[in-house]
């Protein structure tokens, strides 16, 4: 739903920055964009980041004319911190540089900028404290009557930030990861892109470069300060994405997802420039995108959909739901084998999702007594004693490790619901 809303929002942003025609092009490009489909399918927390930033960005553009929108934008910029931790060193940098410009060019009064900073800090502060206590390894969680700022003793994410572990060699690797994934559109992980199409369609890249080069040139030549400030905001949006790619450890597409909306906007701008210069390009461009999007959609809803069942754990989710519905079994013993990986933490999280287990029930004794997570390969003959009269949810390869008589009472794809015999 949020991704669908972003399609309309892209029209509004492009229409505000450019004109209605570019707004329509940007909206259409977003609607058929491979990245838009892929990140919508993968409900990863960080994939909210570009959408919330885009909304805040649009409100920022409106706020340059009407201050109430500017103050509202600060709330949404603050909320980006709860979408993805990299907002701490990307959104903050974007706003700091942009407001320095606005104060310098008298687009904002100092008290207006100060109020914006206060609103932004108030909203972002709890998450900022969470990041801080984990960065310095404070060793304790901070609790208040309204929210808890959690300390995670096993958190390793600070190692992903170049600023905290700087080396020129790593900077070079980060730059190559950014350029290869975003601009060369080389293959990324399964969840992020289909190699034949990339995140933007390969046909888009020439228009992206045309858009970036011409837009940057016109930005520095623009004489009207109000227009230049708007243009600088979009340029800053793009630079923020590049900054994220350079500072974050060897980014993949989902880690640098903030860069794709400005790239789509500048691609639309590049297409408009190309068509304005060479009218006969219009049907060629339309055909290229129609063919590309048609091929993508066919692949996405057929081959990719079939292959993704394994990686999105469809059979596992269905098997767990079916087992949970068998109330005659008081205890469930669920394998950590997802087929493509063994991960007991992931299977527990997926079980909680599939069985709609809320936080209160998760913390209760009833949850601990009913749901158990096992490793059949290492349990051997002892598993029969552990399971007793409970119900096991096992991957097909787990069955060969059972060293006792058993009965398969049902099968769901590659998973079996199994009980002991005797």
Positions of predicted regions on the chain:
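Membrane-interface transmembrane helices that cradle and orient dolichyl/undecaprenyl
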Residues: 17, 53-72, 80
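Short helix- or helix-capping micro-motifs
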Residues: 26-31, 77, 81
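Short acidic/glycine- and proline-prone juxtamembrane loop motifs at membrane-interface regions
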Residues: 35-46
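Transmembrane-helix motifs of polytopic, lipid-linked glycan transferases
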Residues: 1-18, 55, 207-215, 269
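Transmembrane-lumen/periplasm boundary regions of multi-pass, lipid-linked membrane glycan transferases
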Residues: 38, 90-213
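Hydrophobic/aromatic-rich transmembrane helices and adjacent perimembrane loops
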Residues: 39-40, 89, 205-206, 227-276
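Membrane-proximal, lumen/periplasm-facing interface regions of secretory-pathway glyco-
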Residues: 282-327, 334-353, 359, 364-376
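Signature aromatic-anchored transmembrane alpha helix within multi-pass, membrane-resident enzymes
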Residues: 75, 96, 118-121, 265, ...
């Amino acid at each position: 739903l949020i991704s669908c809303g972003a399609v309309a929002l892209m029209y509004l942003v492009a229409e505000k920055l450019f004109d209605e025609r570019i707004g329509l092009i940007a909206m259409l490009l977003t609607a058929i964009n491979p990245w838009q489909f892929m990140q919508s399918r993968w409900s990863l927390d960080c994939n909210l980041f570009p959408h919330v930033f885009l909304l805040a960005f649009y409100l920022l553009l409106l706020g340059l004319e009407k201050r109430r929108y500017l103050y509202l934008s600060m709330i949404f910029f603050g909320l980006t911190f709860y979408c993805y931790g990299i907002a701490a060193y990307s959104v903050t940098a974007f706003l700091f540089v942009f407001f320095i410009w606005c104060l310098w060019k008298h687009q904002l009064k100092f008290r207006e900028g100060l109020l914006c900073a206060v609103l932004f800090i108030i909203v972002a502060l709890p998450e900022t404290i969470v990041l801080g206590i984990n960065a310095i390894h404070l060793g304790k969680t901070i609790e208040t009557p309204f929210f808890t700022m959690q300390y995670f003793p096993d958190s390793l994410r600070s190692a992903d930030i170049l600023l905290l572990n700087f080396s020129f060699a790593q900077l070079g690797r980060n730059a190559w990861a950014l350029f290869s994934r975003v601009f060369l559109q080389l293959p990324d992980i399964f969840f992020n892109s289909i190699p034949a199409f990339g995140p933007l369609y390969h046909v888009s890249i020439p228009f992206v470069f045309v858009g970036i080069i011409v837009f940057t040139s016109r930005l520095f030549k623009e004489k009207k300060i109000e227009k230049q400030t708007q243009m600088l905001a979009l340029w800053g949006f793009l630079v923020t994405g590049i900054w994220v790619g350079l500072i974050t450890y060897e980014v993949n597409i989902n880690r640098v997802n903030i860069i794709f909306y400005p790239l789509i906007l500048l691609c639309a701008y590049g297409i408009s420039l190309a068509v304005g210069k060479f009218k006969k390009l219009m049907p060629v461009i339309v055909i290229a995108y129609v063919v590309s999007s048609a091929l993508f959609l066919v692949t996405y809803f057929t081959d990719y959909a079939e292959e993704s069942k394994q990686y999105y754990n469809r059979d596992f989710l269905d098997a767990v739901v079916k087992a949970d519905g068998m109330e005659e079994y008081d205890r469930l013993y669920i394998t950590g084998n997802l087929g493509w990986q063994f991960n007991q933490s992931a299977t527990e999280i997926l079980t909680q999702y599939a069985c709609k287990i809320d936080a209160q029930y998760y913390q209760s004794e009833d949850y601990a007594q009913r749901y158990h997570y096992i490793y059949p390969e290492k349990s051997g003959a002892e598993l029969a004693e552990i399971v007793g009269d409970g119900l096991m949810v096992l991957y097909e390869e787990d069955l060969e490790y059972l060293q006792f008589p058993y009965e398969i009472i049902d099968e769901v794809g590659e998973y079996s619901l199994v009980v002991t015999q005797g």
